[in-house]
Amino acid sequence: MASLPHPKIVKKHTKKFKRHHSDRYHRVAENWRKQKGIDSVVRRRFRGNISQPKIGYGSNKKTKFLSPSGHKTFLVANVKDLETLTMHTKTYAAEIAHNISAKNRVVILARAKALGIKVTNPKGRLALEA
């Protein structure tokens, strides 16, 4: 269940990159769009304007896609999918897909516990229907 040793996970930028003027106009969604105007102060990176996504904010290759526990997540839809993780319990953790019923989740969780596989969302859907 414990993960392999890895460098400290550092997130260089945790805030979402918001689209310019999304706070000013309701019709402008928050999803990031690159500014392309010739006079755009955001594109020209003037002081005091919103920051833009750039390659420097990228994560370390060794810690990219790692969860805080140090595992990479693997989407599981049935018990058969769990069998693929038996040799990789220190590297990968199972994540039960969103559309799996509570009945099947119980079966998957029991098998994961027997195999010693970490599950990232063990309480999903079970707390409501217990």
Curated annotation (Swiss-Prot):
It is found in: Cytoplasm. SMART domains: Ribosomal_L32e. Keywords: Cytoplasm, Phosphoprotein, Ribonucleoprotein, Ribosomal protein. The keyword Phosphoprotein applies. It comes from the Eukaryota. One of its GO terms (molecular function) is structural constituent of ribosome. InterPro entries: Ribosomal_eL32, Ribosomal_eL32_CS, Ribosomal_eL32_sf. The modification Phosphoserine is found at residue 40. One of its GO terms (biological process) is cytoplasmic translation. GO terms for cellular component: cytoplasm; cytosol; cytosolic large ribosomal subunit. Component of the ribosome, a large ribonucleoprotein complex responsible for the synthesis of proteins in the cell. The small ribosomal subunit (SSU) binds messenger RNAs (mRNAs) and translates the encoded message by selecting cognate aminoacyl-transfer RNA (tRNA) molecules. The large subunit (LSU) contains the ribosomal catalytic site termed the peptidyl transferase center (PTC), which catalyzes the formation of peptide bonds, thereby polymerizing the amino acids delivered by tRNAs into a polypeptide chain. Component of the large ribosomal subunit (LSU). Mature yeast ribosomes consist of a small (40S) and a large (60S) subunit. The 40S small subunit contains 1 molecule of ribosomal RNA (18S rRNA) and 33 different proteins (encoded by 57 genes). The large 60S subunit contains 3 rRNA molecules (25S, 5.8S and 5S rRNA) and 46 different proteins (encoded by 81 genes). Belongs to the eukaryotic ribosomal protein eL32 family. This is Large ribosomal subunit protein eL32.
